């Protein structure tokens, strides 16, 4: 199993490749992350109507196409999606690329019913020993572990399936809502980790606290925090003892 806990420094994780430096969830974003230097490349996995797994954060085509089209990503076939977003890779494309380079991979599974398929593909490409698969879905985590027990899995919290934290109209409400979720988190985390078999707690920085980090570590789990894009916030979460930090711009880690 891949190294998940903090050693002499926190693990550096490029969010959606390097979303600040290239179109997110593309091989170009992966390459930019590798150029800067990361320990893991994170990306999202979503299913299409034809069963193809692709790299996309949500079902909102407006978001995935960066404003070029509207509709539902999951209602499209691969050839239809590629007419709108030609550079969007399939999950197999991503695994093929990552198998050819030296970096860890973090697959954030957005499709609850495809955990078996995701784990089997990671195994087929020989990447189990440097992979983490995470999800908000307990079903997906169960299926991932059932298919490949050696695969490290992470429980994502809170769920942001529809990218609400990125929507401007909701932005003023997000910090308070997230803080409320974080208050009860320390006492709930040990039970959730045990129930899901998760090796990592993937936590939004807004719910993070010293108590949450300590409870996870006491339960034998690592703590990775998302999405950290400011130097002051980076210093704060590192001081709390997190094991991994996810950022849109991995150049932040060089400061």
Label for each model-derived stretch:
Residues 1-255:
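Phosphate-group recognition and catalysis centered on beta-loop-alpha active-site segments
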